[in-house]
From Swiss-Prot:
It comes from the Eukaryota. It comes from Saccharomyces cerevisiae (strain ATCC 204508 / S288c) (Baker's yeast). Residues 706-733, 740-762 have a biased composition (Basic and acidic residues). The chain crosses the membrane at residues 123-143, 170-192, 257-277. Residues 493-733 form the ABC transporter domain. GO terms for molecular function: ABC-type oligopeptide transporter activity; ATP binding; ATP hydrolysis activity; peptide transmembrane transporter activity. This is ATP-dependent permease MDL2, mitochondrial. The gene is MDL2. Its main location: mitochondrion.
Length: 773
């Protein structure tokens, strides 16, 4: 049966799955000569496991049956693409990543360009303090040589040969120099800290500025928790790199240069010997620096994920508690913590290997210099003082090199965090809020011409296709339709959060795709179903976004118009009452009325009401509808309402009905459409009306009621049986049911209910809206 070919084995997958592209990337699998003693013998291969990164799980070859005693020839699955191409791409990616690292570092330091005077002053003070500090080994060497040549002399009679000064005067001058070095060190620390704080503040301001001017597509793809993490933890890492480590790095660089110069002047032979240890140090810094940078970026991303989870849990804490899901959310948070722990552990091992390598090289160099320096002293080629000074310079220079390695490590971490911040600043929004012509408001004529639209995050799901309608100036129009058919999307398109895929949207005969977004939005007021208030006072929220400062009378007038003046005046601080984050100290209806006042005080040309009265009680809704009715009569603005409730639809003059495909199926006066029982509006409102119980629901209730009566009767019989010990056996046989009988009855009840539900589903008809001529 084999006939020179290996048949399809039992791989635990279907034959048609092998044709999928992701399975086509399996590595080449060869089966060597498998000899079977008989044609029907079953060869178990249950232990043979093939693992492919393309699939992500093992494919178990369970068994196959051979019908021939012939040797099975070599057979292989299609091999993957050539390795050379992948290697080339990998090498190119590594080179590109390395280039990006250096670009991020350069960009980070370019932020300090405008403070170059401050930077130069700090470097000058740092040079002074480092130079004085690096003179200590030389001074120690001079003092030791002086003491050796003047053994037995009085201390005050000792003179330094180089300067011809008494030793005590020399030490006094050196003490003054050390004090100057300390003052310079204090000054450089303050200046560099101020400089770094300015750089980080500038970076944060730039990031938040770019973020606030991004388009809606950006916020669809980025969660709030991740953005908060970038502004918080990532900026902190950059701040630490720019404050502590930059200062230490510059100090280490100066100390290293001065130390190498002093060592070369003391003993060129020992200096040449130390050069052999330089390449290994540079090599380790190059190898481990890249790893540290990558782990730092991974750590920041894991921290961002943790922040996202915490932000989602805390913002929805009432939902979590109402569903008693604290345990599930705790598990989610623990998973994010474990991810951070794993990345942190990897970073710890990488840093440990790097610092251990540099420390080992430093210790080896120190011992080598000590051994060879001792030989030079014995050969009278080097004095004891110079050897001591050289050894101290070796230690100082080693610490400087170690400081540079730490500086490089921290800079790589800062580059990893900075790259995430630069991703935000470098992104150009598809809809710039500051580009375009200034909107010239007229009367608020709105027209959609052959508009088709899909959200950028879901391009395959079309919301509109060739949508056409026109809204007259000063009119009141309500947009209704089935849920999820794009009613709120129309509001987003009018505010130009998105551009239509095809077609044009005009306001006052001006194509909004060519208008400045800020200029357009200043003339459009919007009240959403779930209003968002800012932390601050009630006055701040009513006047939010205004380009001028309104008078107290204007604020009070619009508050009365929206029927929120009464409850505001009941607060101790009235309009200056702080309402907390997102208005948490107010009720839902109070927040909604303040949001309406916020929209009306700007006197917009177009007012968009997206379920604006959904959070109000009947009395408040009636009052607000009265206000909107007065606005409609004044014809001062075009009002576009999005609603499901009849009370909201009724107040509008005209109605636009959207169908299931997102197209307009009906337009007209509300009274005319509502009076016509065959109109799309009537059909939609009748479907949304709360119907009485169906026949199936009544039957289900009867079945459940019957079961409850049976259970009650069983309970009474059981109680009677327990009280009557003499007739116990007889009652058990006649009244009590066996467990099997009870289970059968429960199954019958469940099947009856399930059958009735199926019948109800069959009889249920979806909403069908037919276009009216």
């Amino acid at each position: 049966m084999l006939n020179g070919r290996l048949p399809l084995l039992r791989l635990g997958i279907c034959r048609n799955m092998l044709s999928r592209p992701r399975l086509a990337k399996l590595p080449s699998i060869r089966f060597r000569s498998l000899v079977t003693p008989s044609s029907s013998q079953l060869i178990p291969l249950s232990r043979l496991c093939l693992r492919s990164p393309a699939v992500g799980k093992s494919l178990i070859l369970q068994s196959f049956r051979c019908n021939s005693s012939k040797t099975v020839p070599e057979t292989s699955l299609p091999s993957a693409s050539p390795i050379s191409k992948g290697s080339a791409r990998s090498a190119h990616a590594k080179e590109q990543s390395k280039t990006d690292d250096y670009k991020d570092i350069i960009r980070l330091f370019m932020l300090a360009k405008r403070d170059w005077k401050l930077l130069l002053t700090a470097i000058l003070l740092l040079t002074i303090s480092c130079s004085i500090g690096m003179s200590i080994p030389k001074v120690i060497g001079i003092v030791l040589d002086t003491l050796k040549t003047s053994s037995g002399s009085d201390f005050f009679d000792l003179k330094i040969p180089i300067f011809s000064l008494p030793l005590y005067e020399f030490l006094s001058f050196f003490t003054v120099a050390l004090l100057i070095g300390c003052a310079a060190n204090f000054g450089r620390f303050i200046l560099l800290r101020i400089l770094s704080e300015r750089v980080v503040a500038r970076l944060r301001a730039n990031v938040i500025k770019k973020t606030l001017h991004q388009d809606a597509e950006f916020f669809d793809n980025h969660k709030v928790g991740d953005l908060i993490s970038r502004l918080g933890s990532d900026a902190y890492v950059v701040s630490r790199s720019m404050t502590q480590k930059v200062s230490d790095g510059v100090k280490a660089l100066i100390c290293g240069v001065v130390g190498v110069g002093m060592m070369c002047s003391l003993s060129p032979q020992l200096s040449i010997l130390l050069l052999f240890f330089t390449p290994p140090v540079l090599f380790s810094a190059s190898v481990f620096g890249k790893q540290i940078r990558n782990t730092s970026k991974d750590l920041q991303e894991a921290t961002g994920q943790l922040t996202r989870v915490a932000e989602e849990q805390l913002s929805g804490i009432k939902t979590v508690q109402s569903f008693v899901a604290e345990g599930n959310e705790l598990s989610r948070y623990n998973v994010a913590i474990r991810d951070i722990f794993q990345v942190g552990k990897t970073a710890a091992f990488t840093n440990a290997k790097f610092f251990t390598t540099t420390s080992l090289l430093g210790d080896l160099s120190f011992l080598t210099v000590l051994a060879y320096g001792s030989y030079l002293v014995l050969q009278s080629q080097l004095s004891i003082g110079d050897l001591t000074a050289f050894m101290l310079y070796t230690e100082y220079t080693g610490n400087a090199v170690f400081g540079l390695s730490t500086f490089y490590s921290e800079i790589m971490q800062g580059a990893g965090a900075a790259s995430r911040l630069f991703e935000l600043t470098d992104r150009k929004p598809s809809i710039s809020p500051t580009v375009g012509h200034k909107y010239k408001p007229d009367r608020g004529v709105i027209e959609f011409k052959d508009v088709s639209f899909s959200y950028p995050t879901r391009p395959s799901v079309q919301i509109f296709k060739n949508l056409n309608f026109k809204i007259a100036p000063g009119s009141s129009v309500c947009i209704v339709g089935p849920s999820g058919r794009g009613k709120s999307t129309i509001a987003l398109l009018l505010l130009r959060y998105y551009n239509p895929t095809t077609g044009t949207i005009t306001i006052d005969n001006q194509d909004i795709s060519k208008l400045n977004c800020k200029s357009l939005r200043r003339h459009i007021g919007i009240v959403q179903q779930e209003p968002v208030l800012m932390s601050g006072t009630i006055r701040d929220n009513i006047t939010y976004g205004l380009t001028y400062t309104p008078t107290k009378e204007e604020i009070r007038s619009v508050a009365k118009q929206c029927f929120c003046h009464n409850f505001i005046t009941k607060f101790p601080n009235t309009y200056d009452t702080v309402i907390g984050p997102h208005g948490t100290l107010l009720s839902g209806g109070q927040k909604q009325r303040i949001a309406i006042a916020r929209a009306l005080i700007k006197k917009p040309t177009i007012l968009i009401l997206d379920e604006a009265t959904s959070a109000l009680d009947v009395e408040s809704e009636g009052a607000i509808n009265y206000t909107f009715g007065q606005l409609m009569k004044s014809k001062s603005m075009t009002i576009v309402s999005i609603a499901h409730r009849l009370s909201t639809i009724r107040r509008s003059e005209n109605v636009i009905v959207l169908g299931h495909d997102g197209s307009v199926v009906e337009m007209g006066k509300f009274k005319e459409l509502y009076a016509n029982p065959t109109s799309a509006l009537s059909q939609l409102l009748n479907e949304k009306a709360a119907p009485g119980p169906s026949d199936q629901q009544l039957q289900i209730e009867k079945v459940i009621e019957k079961e409850d009566l049976n259970e009650s009767k069983e309970h009474d019989d059981q109680k009677k049986d327990d009280n009557d010990d003499n007739d116990n056996n007889h009652d058990n046989d006649s009244n009590n049911q066996s467990p099997e009988t009870k289970d059968n009855n429960s199954d019958d009840i469940e099947k009856s209910v399930e059958h009735l539900l199926k019948d109800a589903a069959k009889e249920a008809n979806p909403i069908k809206i037919t276009p009216q001529p």
